Amino acid sequence: MSYYGEWKMFRWELEEELAKPKPDEKKIEELLIEIKNAEWMMQHYE
């Protein structure tokens, strides 16, 4: 999967998690880190 594909997937998961009545803060934090990593990789390797 491309870095853009990963970024899109993590963004989609984050939106789903935030839409829940009681979002899991740990999962949100992990997804934000993954999104940031994918953005960095896109800037430097694609």
Where do the protein language model's features map onto the residues?
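Short amphipathic alpha-helical heptad-repeat segments
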Residues: M1-E15
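Amphipathic alpha-helix face/heptad-repeat signature
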Residues: Y3, L31-E34
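Positively charged, low-complexity intrinsically disordered regions
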Residues: W12, P23, H44-Y45
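Charged, low-complexity interaction regions
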Residues: L18-I28
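Amphipathic alpha-helical coiled-coil segments
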Residues: N37-E46
